[in-house]
Amino acid sequence: MKIFNSLDWKQRKTIILHDTFLYKGWGERLILMMAKALDCDIASGFFSRGSFNLRDEGFQGKMIEVSSEVFKKGYRHLKLKQAFLFKTKFLQDYDTVIFSWDCISAIRNCSPDSKKIYYCHTPPRYLYDLRDEYLKKIPSYIKPAFNLVSWAFRKMYEKEVKKFDVILSNSINTWKRLHHFTWEESQVLYPPVELDKFQWIDQWDYYLSVSRLSTAKRIDNIVKAFKQMPDKKLVVIYGINDPQKEEIFELAKDCKNIEFITCPWNEWFTDYVWKSIAWICIPIDEDFWMVPVESMSAWKPVIWVDEGWIKESVINGETWVLIPEWWAVEDIIKAVEYLTPQVALSMKTRCIERAQDFSYSEFEKKIREFVK
């Protein structure tokens, strides 16, 4: 049993260690909101120019970078693993350390008396449920090394995850996955949405995709569907560091009804959200994603695939349109054709009612309780 000193959360010196600020993603934005709620510091492998500028977003705490920016995925994992193991001695200075994403090897550098919290977005998918997908992309001569390293990293992860005082999962889906792979128990704490940033303004003539251009998000299939619907317009918002960017650009070449836009979070983004017909998201077994909740906050329904955490957040036929788990591009087309501007408008009241359950104020209250 470990007994923590009875400090108020404001008195506890707290830091969040997040693996990388590489993208303008929902994981990165969650850490920013969490840090503001706790008035704490942030450490990361690196802070990329392609991610949020935390100072511009109002973050005033200390920022600690333990490595340097690197894009090549396999090398990045190895370099960051070394940095988290050997360059995080500063964690000893904190009363509470919150770990986010793939950085928990640094737990060995925390003070024995500190409170260690793991906010689990998912067990590393390249080590577990999507391991075979990653393996397919690796040249044959590298596969033996990948198998050896991934085996070692899995053993490390399963040993390290047992050292936490508190484990939080971002959804029931993540709770199940973490328990399945590690047998560890956790408590569910849904990420928040800043509801005041989203509102219904108007409805224009386009559907919206707001996802990283990567294999796991399956944006290529959304593009394929809209290539067959030249009368329907698609706007894709992406990040400059997205790994599948060039491939998807080439796929959409000469399609006048598909537009790609990259923009900082606080510039133009909400304008595109407010004026869309609906959002389209078909990721692979997603753990938690703010996309559908933010969409509902803007009174916009979602087209989603019948897998992952989404069943926890939206109501079929009232706040979303569902495509089958074993879907084809034709199912995306059918969903878009069904979700006309008129049908989307009829869903807007239920959308905003459901989004209220994911408010920032509720998240702020709960995360402060866990830090005590």
Spans of features found by a protein language model:
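Active-site donor-binding segments of glycosyltransferases and PAPS-dependent sulfotransferases
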Residues: 41-107
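A charged, aromatic-enriched C-terminal amphipathic alpha-helix characteristic of glycosyltransferases
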Residues: 78-81, 341, 345-371
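Membrane-proximal helix-turn-helix segments that form the acceptor-binding/catalytic region
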Residues: 135-167, 176
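Conserved donor-binding/catalytic core segment of Leloir-type glycosyltransferases
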Residues: 199-217, 223-229, 234-237
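Nucleotide-activated donor-binding/catalytic signature segment of Leloir-type glycosyltransferases, i.e.
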Residues: 245-270
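Aromatic "clamp/platform" in nucleotide-sugar-dependent glycosyltransferases that forms part
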Residues: 284
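Short hydrophobic beta-strand element within catalytic cores of glycosyltransferases
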Residues: 301-305, 314
